[in-house]
From Swiss-Prot:
Keywords: Chloroplast, Plastid, Ribonucleoprotein, Ribosomal protein, RNA-binding, rRNA-binding
Function: One of the primary rRNA binding proteins, it binds directly near the 3'-end of the 23S rRNA, where it nucleates assembly of the 50S subunit.
Organism: Trieres chinensis (Marine centric diatom)
GO CC annotation: chloroplast; cytosolic large ribosomal subunit
SUPFAM superfamilies assigned: Translation proteins
Similarity remark: Belongs to the universal ribosomal protein uL3 family.
A Pfam family matched in the record: Ribosomal_L3
NCBIfam families, A to Z: L3_bact
Alphabetized InterPro entries for the sequence: Ribosomal_uL3 (IPR000597), Ribosomal_uL3_bac/org-type (IPR019927), Ribosomal_uL3_CS (IPR019926), Transl_B-barrel_sf (IPR009000)
Chief location: plastid
Domain of life the protein comes from: Eukaryota
Identification of the protein by name: Large ribosomal subunit protein uL3c
Subunit structure: Part of the 50S ribosomal subunit.
Length: 207
């Protein structure tokens, strides 16, 4: 796995390409991220790089978090995330990584928390078909049967039922990079990414 990046979703808009076609795009504020720890197979049992993102004040962190960063002489950072890599010797603590490691035309995977939509029924949450609306039917949006009888005498795990929709970590794959702005640390990608504007997102180069 390659080293990823952290950033925030700014929002969606649309741009025109050279042929005049409209392309829906999402604008992401990515990095700069700081490498806070380098883990090796020899010392830690596996190879990984930990990066930090988002400057905050000292009082925003717990003492263990603050001590972890101060040990490497790194300013307080709001988010820490670890990425498995094959070549940790190529990185060093304090190194800054940003959008300049990406290029136009590349494909990336973006992970974030989807927008929460609250308690939702089966039609909205699982795309169930509703019952008849007329002719005396009282089964409009009811779930119907949720299992068998005395045997097994329980509702089987994983049964699709009403409940909270959204607010889960999800990934959108193979998003094409339309534009990279290294000066402003802005990434413009084709399509949508999970979550609302301001949400934290993780960016990986697609396999």
């Amino acid at each position: 796995m390659s080293l990823g990046l952290l950033g925030n979703k700014i929002g969606m808009t649309q741009i025109f390409d050279e042929s005049g076609n409209i392309i829906p795009v999402t604008i992401l504020k990515v990095g700069p991220c700081v490498i806070t720890q380098v883990k090796t197979d020899l010392n830690d049992g596996y190879n990984a790089i930990q990066i930090g993102y988002g400057t905050v004040s000292n009082k925003s962190l717990t003492q263990p978090e603050l001590g972890h960063l101060q040990k490497s002489n790194i300013q307080p950072l709001k988010y820490l995330k670890e990425f498995r890599v094959n070549n940790p010797e190529e990185f060093k603590v304090g190194q800054v990584v940003n959008v300049e490691s990406l290029s136009t035309g590349q494909f990336i995977d973006v992970t974030g928390k989807s927008s929460g939509k609250g308690f939702s029924g089966l039609q909205k949450r699982h795309n169930f078909t509703r019952g008849p609306m007329t002719h005396g039917s009282k089964n409009h949006r009811a779930p119907g049967s949720i299992g068998m009888g005395t045997t097994p005498g329980r509702v089987l795990p994983g049964k699709k039922m009403a409940g909270q929709l959204g607010n889960k970590v999800t990934k959108t794959k193979k998003l094409k990079i339309i534009q990279v702005n290294g000066n402003e640390n802005i990434l413009v990608v084709k399509g949508s990414v999970p979550g609302k504007p301001g949400n934290l997102v993780t960016i990986h180069v697609s396999n």
